[in-house]
Amino acid sequence: MIGVGILKGMGVTARNFVGSYFEKDRLTTVQYPEERSPLPENYRNFPILIYDTDDPNAGLRCVACKICEKECPPQCIYIIKSEDKKPDYMGKPQFYPAVFDIDISVCMSCQICVEVCPFEAIKMDKDFELSKRERFDALLTRKGELSKSNEYYHRIHPIEAAEVDAKLAEAAAAAAAKKKAA
């Protein structure tokens, strides 16, 4: 019989259509933007810069080593290192990025920049609502827009953020013990 497969498929569709009216768990759509689907822990969109203090410029973890810029496959990261040094979030004088831009129109969200960063300064964001009023405003994201607090990072990736903070605290304790021993 030629139409048996079509009838079986239509039966499955009708069963799911009718069943979704009686069982709320079977609904797959949500009323966006009032309701939002939960994003998984490992969801990633575009890179952000993490800072640890109240001031995004003073607490930025990035020391402008340019490893992420060199390793980026589409070469969408643009960094200019500062001429002077400022104390970082741990009080150690470090260089900082005078300019840190990411061309979002070129970025392919591969997360290589996150993997190669030795300072845990660049992470992937979960924000996917990137619309702007002007056509070209969303293409190039500057340091001010990329900078997000460590608290924000804890909200979007709680497990990974706790691991990173524990590793950074351990490194700070080891550095303090080494300084005390010397």
Language-model regions, residue ranges each:
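Non-ligating segments of multi-cofactor redox enzymes
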Residues: M1-V106, E115, E120, M124-A182
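Basic, alpha-helical nucleic-acid-binding regions used in initiation and control of genome expression
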Residues: C110
